[in-house]
Amino acid sequence: MYVLRCLTLGAMTAALMTSNNGLRMSTTSRLYSIQEREAPIQKQKLDKINEMKQASVNLRHPLVEDLADLETISISHDSYNLLKFHGSYQQDDREKRKKGQEKAFQFMLRLKVPSGECPGAVYNVLDDLCENYGQKDLRITTRQAWQIHGILKKDLKHVIRTIMEAGSTTIGGCGDINRNVMLPPAPIDDDNRPQYRVARHWAAVCAELFVPQTEAFSEIWCDGTKLASVQYWKRHIYTDNDSLDPAQLKNIKSIEEFKKNDESQVDNFIQDWMRRDNGHGIILPKSETTEPIYGETYLPRKFKIGVTVEGDNSIDVYINDIGVVVCDDLSGVNILVGGGLGRTHGKQTTFARTAQEMAYVPNEQIPQVLKAIVAVQRDHGNREIRANARLKYLVHTLGIDAFKSLVEAYHGASLDPPRPMKPWRYSDWLGWHDAGDGTLFCGINVEQGRIRDFDGENAPQLRSFLKDAIKNTGCDLILSPSQSIILRNIQPDDKKNIHALMIQHNILPVEAVDPLTRLSMACPALPLCGLAVTEAERYLPTMLTRIRALLDHLSMNREEVLIRMTGCPNGCARPYMAELAFVGDGKSSYQLYIGGSPALTRVGFAYKDRCKVASIEHDLEPLFIMWRDQREHPYESFGDFVHRLGKDALLQFTASYTPTAPLATA
């Protein structure tokens, strides 16, 4: 049995044993009082990936050597894991492999796109890159980032450098570091709703506060030179002083103006806040590492932060390692910790988990508390068993009160309890909206996030539409957490131009999109994802058509259900939060999850394993019949209904039910 031991507030001396679900935590000890550090951290046993990170010299080797070898089209296993920190995954097309061909290795790039914000000029660069070096499409991720698929090894350096020269980056897209920071996709900017402006500020701070400090990125991709371009999201940090206080925010609209006058100031005080040492062990000694927060082995596992405002759960805030909720009075934020969805079929020590409310933090303390949470995960997260390395397992094992005490020890002060918040609601922000600053924004549905000019009569020409919209109206883009896209900075006179372009390029207005499609998400899965066991993105449209036909058959044609699909249990499309989810568990089967909330506030439950694609109507029909006939009121959602009844009652009913719906051709 493994033990996690810590002293917090000078009083917690008892060892915290593993929880009764058998979750194993690596042995570690950090002795703290609020006043001072009392003893060093005991060294943990490291798994192979942590050993690789430690030996890499801050993310350099053996990647440098493998990339220099252009005689091969692939890289070694160690470089494969190291390359993730640089924002790329090596992939091969399994369908080609199945045909007996040699592996056709290629690389996927994932950009860091804080808050999903993408200027039109950056989109044009990405469009050119996917046309000339990729597979002629782009994909919006569920964390508001871009992915470019199909890059060859010989082109990696050119493509990544071009992205950096455009004012973006792939650093922070992947790896055991802070990944893309999420934010509601609504570019609201008015004095009646200042919370959104403040949330943008804190999202940009989170994105910059945890940037890796190694020079490996510039050495490998830019020949050691510092590029002159500015990362556009930094302008949301700019204040009248170096306090990062959002009350001092300056409204910088122009990237060019920011670059000319203010970029160096922001860089300087972000560096100051990053390295500011309170003497309680957050910052590592310079003699030990070039990474003041991460250290030589970086974090035990990926780390995710989402920022939102009270009531707006468009980002799935409860699935993040840290959720930051701007309070309505703008005095501070509520901090949530310990969310995460990845799990493994048949392994009960892995599970999906929603974040818990930990504390209210006033504005002046936010950067320090965020650093303290990351430092706790750095020092106490599991580095021996990678499947249990996420922060959620540490919070689960310690309990929220003990975890909060540990954060307080690093922070050097006690934290207030979280404040009451508004009820949550989910919005995808599609359709037309007033931004509040004299401009409009318009959300366009993108099925499964794939930006492509699709083949076929009346098929959407999304790439051409976006290029023309940017060219004709000067609009910018925001990538949404539901894999759709927001056109922003639209002048009212250009609304008719956007409408005309939508018609020209076969883009449906949101009113014409089936709610099942609008609410759905899927991961890419086959053929490129090495973890996928079955289809997701390519099959979900067919599955939605079948479900709509089933609802019509049951005289439920007006119903909406939030549906998600993944090709494996790792949870990239956040299936466990959905009302109805299909989680791949076999070549032609899915584990059926039900009972998530329409407001995305709880994890659903596993209802049935190995549901065959060919007979999915028979699995769903009795559930829909119960929902139709037994709900408490006409507006009780499917997720709330099955959650209220529970698994046993559902199974009891379905055991004696004879389906009537015809099976579709799978």
Regions found by a protein language model. Give the residues of each.
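N-terminal chloroplast transit peptides
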Residues: 1-22
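Peripheral terminal and linker regions in Fe-S/redox and tRNA-modifying enzymes
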Residues: 26-666
